């Protein structure tokens, strides 16, 4: 069995990960997969997720914990283990760092959202949240678009500074701005990506603040979490979700639905965009991702196959 840690997974090219995420959406369209509802256990502010999924060749199970307060102790908020197995024999093939898989595939989900929902003319963007996922979102944003100015906001100034320093090593040909407030970031950005576990909207907005912009919410995955104010979904020309499970799981969708700000039939699955060649020019769009085990499966299987080919990782025996 192959063991792949964070460093091994980090050697995989971003294009491989994003292609794997796109393959997951294609499987959604073809329905050639089996993805049971994930088990979602809450313990006060903390969450445990068990996420299984099956395809023709592989099946995968990810066990992930989300402890938001861990960052205050210098620890990552998300930890996890991914097991990839052969769907013919049932034999485990690989064990992987689940947090690294989550960070990479979720970054690619946001990146693919940027690629499909925006034009190449966008030059300004903002990231709300400077944790592991905020960094991953920034990397995939910059992989897909030549941004000239990137605004970053976090409650921790040190986290913002650290994220900027890390990004500069890989993407040096742009201006980085440590936003003083979320509102400053939103006003000055064409694309806004939120990667937080906020219990309440990160900012207040007027219609002029949001008109013609793309909003991507990545962080909220419980009904009591909401990153964006409901005026965005109310005024949006289009609302997309990676899975319809988001209508129940995330407060960014569930709360506006409960308050009758939007009707459920106005919410579309992002996978449908892969069948079209639609261009969204000057549209206000909300894309909400809560993630799904199918992303983990296609990402893990792509990484595994490339790791075997290139002799990446460590072989283990039970």
Go through each PLM region and give its residues.
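Adenosine-phosphate binding glycine-rich loop
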Residues: 221-318
């Amino acid at each position: 069995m192959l063991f792949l840690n964070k460093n091994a997974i980090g050697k995989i090219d971003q294009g491989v990960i994003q292609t794997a995420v796109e393959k997951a959406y294609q499987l959604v369209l073809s329905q050639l997969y089996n993805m049971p509802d994930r088990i979602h256990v809450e313990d006060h502010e903390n969450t445990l997720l068990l996420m299984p999924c099956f395809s023709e060749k592989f099946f995968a199970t990810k066990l992930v914990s989300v402890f938001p307060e861990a960052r205050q102790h210098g620890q990552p908020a998300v930890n996890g283990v991914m097991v990839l197995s052969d769907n013919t024999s049932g034999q485990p093939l690989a064990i992987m760092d689940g947090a690294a898989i989550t960070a990479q595939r979720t970054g690619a989900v946001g990146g693919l959202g940027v690629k499909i929902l925006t034009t190449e003319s966008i030059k300004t963007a903002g990231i709300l949240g400077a944790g592991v996922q905020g960094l991953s979102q920034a990397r995939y944003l910059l992989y897909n678009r030549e941004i000239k100015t990137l605004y970053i906001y976090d409650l921790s100034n040190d986290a913002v500074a650290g994220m900027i320093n890390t990004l500069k090593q890989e993407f040096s040909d742009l201006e980085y701005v440590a936003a003083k407030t979320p509102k400053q970031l939103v006003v000055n950005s064409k694309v806004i990506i939120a990667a937080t576990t906020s219990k309440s909207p990160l900012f207040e907005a007027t219609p002029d603040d949001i008109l013609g912009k793309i909003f991507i919410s990545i962080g909220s995955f419980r009904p009591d979490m909401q990153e964006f104010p409901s005026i965005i979904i109310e005024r949006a020309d289009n609302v997309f979700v990676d899975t319809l499970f988001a209508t129940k799981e995330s407060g960014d969708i569930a709360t506006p639905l409960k308050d009758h700000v939007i009707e459920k039939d106005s919410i579309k699955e992002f996978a449908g965009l892969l069948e079209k060649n639609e261009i969204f020019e000057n549209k206000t769009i909300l894309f909400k991702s809560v993630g799904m085990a199918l992303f983990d499966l296609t990402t893990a299987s792509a990484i595994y196959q490339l790791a075997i080919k290139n002799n990446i990782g460590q072989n283990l025996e039970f």
